[in-house]
């Protein structure tokens, strides 16, 4: 198609030599514009039916003008977003710094408390060890005393003579028998007196009273 249109234009063109220079240039411009229009129409007609028609391309200047018109608002939004991000970062850093400072303050206190607790544990362990040692010493002393007492008892039983012991037992028995005999004699005399008094007849008593 393009070749045909070119040939037709060439056929209708008059010779450049016959026309003046100004007319020839104007004719060439018109011919070029007409050829471009025909090409655009031919390209638009050759597009497939299913595909949508291609959008006409905007000139570069119009795109630049649109971009320039959109730039101020977008730039303002970008700047505000950047400011917000910077503020968020500052706040996060400040909070982290505060937490670190507080943790730094708390760490010495924790260390002090840990040291005190460890010292108390050590002291308690020492007291417990001392108590165990004292208990062991007391047990050893008690065992020694028991052994000594048992040895003394065994030696006493061994040193006693049977003869002396028998004599002591006999003397003790004699001493016990003497007071018992005395008691029996006293009782017999009392009983005799009472019995003799009781045996006096009643008439003799009256006579004794009258004689007095």
Curated annotation (Swiss-Prot):
Q: Where is the composition biased (Polar residues)?
A: 71-85
Q: Where is the composition biased (Basic and acidic residues)?
A: 61-70, 99-115, 124-144, 168-180
| Chain coiled-coil ranges | none
Region (Disordered), start-end ranges: 1-148, 168-190
Query: What PANTHER family would the database entry show?
Result: RIKEN CDNA 1700029H14 GENE
Protein name per the record: Uncharacterized protein C13orf46
Organism, as annotated: Homo sapiens (Human)
Which taxonomic lineage is given here?
Answer: Eukaryota, Metazoa, Chordata, Craniata, Vertebrata
Q: Which gene encodes it?
A: C13orf46
């Amino acid at each position: 198609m393009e070749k045909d249109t070119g040939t037709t234009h060439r056929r209708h063109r008059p010779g450049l030599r016959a026309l003046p220079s100004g007319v020839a240039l104007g004719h060439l411009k018109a011919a070029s514009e007409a050829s471009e229009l025909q090409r655009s129409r031919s390209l638009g007609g050759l597009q497939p039916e299913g595909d949508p028609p291609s959008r006409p391309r905007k000139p570069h200047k119009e795109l630049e003008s649109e971009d320039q018109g959109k730039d101020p608002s977008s730039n303002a939004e970008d700047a505000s977003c950047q400011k917000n991000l910077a503020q968020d970062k500052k706040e996060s850093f400040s909070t982290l710094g505060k937490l670190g400072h507080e943790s730094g303050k708390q760490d010495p206190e924790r260390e002090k408390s840990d040291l005190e607790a460890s010292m108390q544990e050590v002291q308690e362990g020492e007291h417990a060890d001392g108590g165990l040692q004292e208990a062991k010493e007391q047990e050893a002393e008690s065992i020694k005393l028991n052994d000594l007492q048992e040895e003394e008892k065994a030696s006493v039983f061994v040193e006693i003579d049977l003869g002396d012991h028998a004599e002591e037992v006999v003397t003790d028995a004699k001493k016990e028998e003497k007071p018992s005999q005395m008691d029996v004699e006293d009782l017999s005399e009392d009983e005799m007196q009472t019995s003799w008094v009781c045996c006096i007849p009643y008439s003799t008593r009256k006579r004794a009273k009258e004689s007095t």
